[in-house]
């Protein structure tokens, strides 16, 4: 199976995650499941726990975009924790490209 990359773009007012790790057939990839679960948790946390002003979410096959007006400290803390988890997955599986 050809290995591809999950791309992660973190900007001041947005996060974009796209791609597939290619570590296993679609739906069976441990790194993809980890990134997907962590990213979904981040989106739910920013929307429902932090209630981040101007938060928006767009989901398509293999692509998630989140955007907001201005970060709060609570939102930054959630994003930092999410990012640390992604770094662990990247180190273990080598399938995440941070842009």
Where do the model's predicted regions map?
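N-terminal intrinsically disordered, cationic/polar leader segments
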Residues: 1-30, 37-99
């Amino acid at each position: 199976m050809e290995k591809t990359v999950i791309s992660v773009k973190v900007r001041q007012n947005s996060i974009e995650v796209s791609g597939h790790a290619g570590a296993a057939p679609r739906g069976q990839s441990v790194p993809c499941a980890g990134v997907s679960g962590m990213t979904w948790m981040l989106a739910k946390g920013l929307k429902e726990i932090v209630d981040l002003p101007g938060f928006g979410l767009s989901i398509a096959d293999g692509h998630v975009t989140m955007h907001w007006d201005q970060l709060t400290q609570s939102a930054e803390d959630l994003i930092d924790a999410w990012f640390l988890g992604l770094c662990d997955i990247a180190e273990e599986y080598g399938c995440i490209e941070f842009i």
